[in-house]
């Protein structure tokens, strides 16, 4: 196999983009926004329960799907198409979070679970592509490049979102009530 630099960089830059979901949505702002905007802010135990259930349900769904998706990925002919499908599914549902009105926690949880299933499922196909773009000798260095770019991309977007959240007046196009919606 001859290594193609363009394929290596494309693979690594996907991690740059998809790690932003993990840092910004999953770890950073969805839990905050869920508790303060969609769920009842006066009942943190209830919102913690709903968010915990959402995380449990998506994890169970992904655990059930993973062996089947992994088998499909091992066959090799549909890796890229399925990566695109699941990434698109996750992107659409994440983008949809910005149109969900305050108090509609059920819809927010549904969109979040579908987005996270898309994110996790796309990673199955993303991970399987490394053997198609890197020689056995280079797998570690290519994987490290993707991992490093993922941390960089996720960290930079998280920093930008923290600034947007703490100092919304820096960004004129944000409206006070919906400032967090644009984080998604």
Residue ranges and their predicted role:
Residues 45-49, 136-147, 180:
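Loop-to-transmembrane helix entry/capping segments in MFS-fold secondary transporters
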Residues 116, 140-165:
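Glycine-rich segments within core transmembrane alpha-helices of 12-TM secondary carriers
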Residues 119-138:
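Intracellular juxtamembrane helix-capping segments at the cytosolic ends
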Residues 69-74, 164:
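Hydrophobic alpha-helical transmembrane and interfacial-helix anchor sites in secondary transporters
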Residues 25, 48-71, 92-93, 155-158:
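Central cavity-lining transmembrane alpha-helices of secondary-active solute carriers
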Residues 27-38, 154-178:
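Transmembrane alpha-helix termini and helix-breaking/packing motifs in multi-pass membrane transporters
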Residues 63, 83-105:
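C-terminal ends and interior cores of transmembrane alpha-helices
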Residues 2-59, 105-109:
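Helix-loop boundary and gating motifs at the non-cytosolic
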